[in-house]
Structure formats: structure tokens, C-alpha cells
Amino acid sequence: NFIMRKKIINQKILNLASDTSNFGLKYKSKYFASHKNKKCGDKIKVELEIKNNKVKKMYYETESCIFCQASASLLSKNIQNTFVENIDKIITSKRFKVLLDKKYLSRKDCVMLPYQAVKKAL
């Protein structure tokens, strides 16, 4: 049962990372940032479309591990139509629970990298 549960969680992370619907930058917005995890070398670039103080769209490109890719994908979907001042609530939501699980504690910096890049872009 433990092995099965572990595989399911890993499959969830794989599924998140493989969703690349918001992958690819447009280079049309002033809300842009790149960020690097100095511990592991993961890199991300993010671009935000913001209108009326709401994030309408997030685009990203990564050179990173699966945890950072999954986090970027998940964040890019959940940030849409979020007021800029409410972005902090997304990363602590239940949606990120699978990525912030204590058994992946050593990957927390990887998971947080897209969020940090978004904050930097603002």
C-alpha cells in the first residue's frame, strides 16, 4: 500500500509537470523575471499579463527538475484571475499540498522557485 501510494503521488507530480499549456514566453509584458535556485541550479523565467491589478495569464520557461516544472505549471493555472495582493494565498492552498509534502522537504526550494520568480516580476 505504501509503495502504491508513493507511486500515485509521483504520478500526480509527473502529470502536473507534463502539463505545458502555459509553457513558453511571449515577451510582451513588462512583468517579467528570471530566477535561479543557487542550491541546485534550477532556472525559471516568468512573464505575467496583468490587467486591473489581476493576473490574467502566467507564462513560464524552465531549465529545472520535475518539482519546479510541476510547481510552475500548477501556479500558472491557479494564478489566473487572482488579484496581485492575493498571490501569497495560492502557494499555501491545498492545491500545492502534493508538492509541499514533508517527504519532499528537500525539494521545497525547487517548488518555491516559480512563486519567487512571480514575486520578483511584480
Kindly give the residue locations of the regions a language model identified.
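Structured beta-strand/loop patches that form or line metal/cofactor-binding pockets in enzymes
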Residues: 15-52, 57
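Active-site- and interface-proximal helix/loop "cap" or "latch" segments in soluble metabolic
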Residues: 54, 59-111
